[in-house]
């Protein structure tokens, strides 16, 4: 499937917002990416030529992270920041600042615009994060090897922006 699909792929980007930006600017007609990135292009950048299509089988998701570095100069201040960053008071500011993801913080208010575009926190595919973490290198190598075997120039850094 991916080898056949490759014939229609302009660029593989590691940028989550890249596909929706490319559609918005007219560089391509279809982009596969995260829905919240598409919403950002529509709401914040005014690209009214983007239509979001949500698979009935569920959407993918990403997990943001925050951390305190070992040996941080001010670990107590860092702990206070993380407590605030994970509070409803902070995450409720997300949509006001161009972040339209569904929130996972208890008692946080979901961005209204996300629901208006059809995002549904109950419509998320069953995703095995442990398997993906453990096997990502293998899965990427399998796809890249299959593409190379089909004749795709996987060394083309303009098309395969994955490093």
Describe each PLM feature range.
Residues 1-53:
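Ligand-binding pocket segment of bilobal, Venus flytrap-like solute-binding proteins
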Residues 4, 18, 22, 27, ...:
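Extracytoplasmic/secreted proteins, especially bacterial periplasmic and envelope-associated proteins
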Residues 6-10, 24, 28, 73, ...:
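Sec-exported extracytoplasmic/periplasmic mature domains
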Residues 9, 30, 49, 101-102, ...:
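Residue-level detector of short coil/turn "hinge" positions at structural boundaries
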Residues 13-17, 71-76, 88, 129-137:
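Soluble non-cytosolic domains of exported or imported proteins
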Residues 56:
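Residues at the C-termini of beta-strands that transition into short coil/loop
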Residues 59-60, 64, 69-126, 159-160:
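Mature extracytoplasmic/periplasmic domains
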Residues 119-163:
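Conserved C-terminal helix/tail region of periplasmic/extracytoplasmic solute-binding proteins
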């Amino acid at each position: 499937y991916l080898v056949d699909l490759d014939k229609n792929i302009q660029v593989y980007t590691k940028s989550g917002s890249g596909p929706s930006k490319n559609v918005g600017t007219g560089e391509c007609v279809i982009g596969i990416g995260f829905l919240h990135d598409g919403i950002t292009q529509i709401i914040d950048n005014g690209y009214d030529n983007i239509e979001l299509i949500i698979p009935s089988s569920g959407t993918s998701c990403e997990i943001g992270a925050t951390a305190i570095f070992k040996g941080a100069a001010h670990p107590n201040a860092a702990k206070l920041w993380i407590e605030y960053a994970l509070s409803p008071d902070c995450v409720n500011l997300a949509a006001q600042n161009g972040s339209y993801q569904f929130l996972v913080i208890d008692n946080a208010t979901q961005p209204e615009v996300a629901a208006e575009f059809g995002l549904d926190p109950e419509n998320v595919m069953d995703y095995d994060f442990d398997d993906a973490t453990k096997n990502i290198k293998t899965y990427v190598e399998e796809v890249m090897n299959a593409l190379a075997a089909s004749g795709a120039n996987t060394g083309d850094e303009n098309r395969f922006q994955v490093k």
